[in-house]
């Protein structure tokens, strides 16, 4: 196959920011390698084989990539219409999860989808829907952003309801989503006094979640344990051991020792396995990949000609990379345990699909701006060509 044919196929099928594509492919490869290394104990406990879990995870990774590809082919402006309904659907789903959800990490965070018998986290759908709809609402109210009734009240209601319901079972996810909402509102030129009101709504929602939710006591205990190093939790202790023993170049692929001790080495502590097996070099590479993803997402936001595209790309990029930073910070001892997975790397089902959708939408924004810039450049070239023809005829 000739290089020109390959380039033509890539240009046709992998549109948008090519750097983002490269970063996602690199993180997906790292995910397959590290998860395969860390699922031995899980397979043994469930009387299964590591190969079966490897195939399942690899399928999930490709499913996420497929979701990303489909999402990047769709004009990002359509998402505000489709996911407006998803925002309304998220409310009863979150309430149902709180009352009848499956236990995951000692909390009711998932529900089982009928027919396909797969666990699903409604908070993933709710987070994506809120970010998209918040970006849409603010982009439409740019001319009257100071209007309390038109611009502020809808934002306060939706942020308070969605973040509050998520906080009932997953406080850390609610806090990250709330921070993302604050960023979108700040970029969307929301007045500072209104941002202060949003903070007040967030504090009230958080207080209600601590009182009535299932994770209030756990969250306070984890914060206390983080402050008092003499009460270091089991996971945090062995996560730091993995980091400390990894050294500069690591123990090599498949040679982790803490993978057999950590309760979830393939999930929220997968970064510990990355450092233990690939050393400080591997840890830095993963960190840099996420920073590149953030930079390219923010660049797409900056280059966007439409307010909706800019707010959308900025919000999704920040939410995804902030989650990654929290996960890595917990592993190296910079924060209390949160249970947050490492996006695009941790083993997961529908979470991988929703992450793929988020990245695909970012790519859709970058693709749209590239096409507009290309169209403007082509139009300018045509004008210049016509002017030259006229000059030639006049001469």
Regions found by a protein language model. Name each.
Residues 144-152, 194, 298-318, 374:
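Membrane-interface helix-loop-helix junctions at transmembrane boundaries of multi-pass membrane enzymes
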Residues 2-27, 33-168, 328-343, 347, ...:
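Membrane-helix boundary/helix-loop-helix interface segments in multi-pass membrane proteins
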Residues 138, 180-194, 258-282, 341-355:
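Interfacial segments of multi-pass membrane proteins
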Residues 66, 74, 133, 207, ...:
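Transmembrane alpha-helix boundary/anchor motif
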Residues 301-339, 345:
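Loop-to-helix entry and N-terminal half of a specific, functionally important transmembrane alpha helix
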Residues 84-85, 90-91, 148-167, 171-211:
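Hydrophobic alpha-helical segments of polytopic membrane proteins
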Residues 104, 108-110, 196-286, 305-312:
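Hydrophobic, glycine- and aromatic-enriched re-entrant/interface helices and adjoining loop segments
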Residues 59-67, 277-294:
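Hydrophobic alpha-helical transmembrane segments
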